[in-house]
Amino acid sequence: MPRRTPAIALALVVCAALAAVAFARTKPRYLPEHRARYLPEYTASGELILPKNSIWREWVFVGAPLTPNALNGGKAGFPEYHNVYMEPGSYEIFKKTGEFPDGTIMFKELQLTLSGENPDGSRTEPSGRGYFPGPFNGADVTVKDTKRYAATGGWGFYNFNHHEPKAPTATLKPREECAYCHIANAKKDEVWTQFYRLLDK
């Protein structure tokens, strides 16, 4: 009976080599693919359309500053958590270039604090005394477009209500309502990167 061991061994080596080549050409599923960017959409009259299906909650979370009323004489301009998300495709470009590309959407979802039990507006929960997130309360959105918003340094500012539900569309805010403060005080390109460590490079 002829010996087949060398032939079988050779076949196994060839199969293993082919499998290795195929594996090398296939990206593992856990590696992130290049993201298709979610770009801003506008109505025919130029209003910004609220991103669909609350998709911003799946975007890159960059920070949540808090300015409660109780610490601002009851008159805080934004008496909520500012839960800020950045569109992922734009974030990938920012990581590589250090610049916010045209089409960048920064979505600030406002969230009230739970009612306070103390003069400073804080309350006590199992984790300790502090401020705790409550109901959502509308949203502010900024969009980068150096041509469309040339008059305000390349960014457009929008409000989708300071209550729920969020408005389906929003009109561009005048320079004196939002842009002037960002231009004067934000650390990088009208973005408060000094409060968003993920972006503070």
What are these regions (language model features)?
Residues A9-A19:
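Bacterial N-terminal signal peptides
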Residues P32-E99:
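N-terminal secretory signal peptides
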Residues M1-A11:
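Bacterial N-terminal signal peptides that target proteins for export
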Residues A22-T26:
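Boundary at the C-terminal end of the N-terminal hydrophobic targeting segment
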Residues P6, A16, L48, P65, ...:
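Compositionally biased, intrinsically disordered low-complexity regions
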Residues K27-H34, S45, I55-E58, P68, ...:
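Sequence context surrounding c-type heme c attachment/ligation sites in exported
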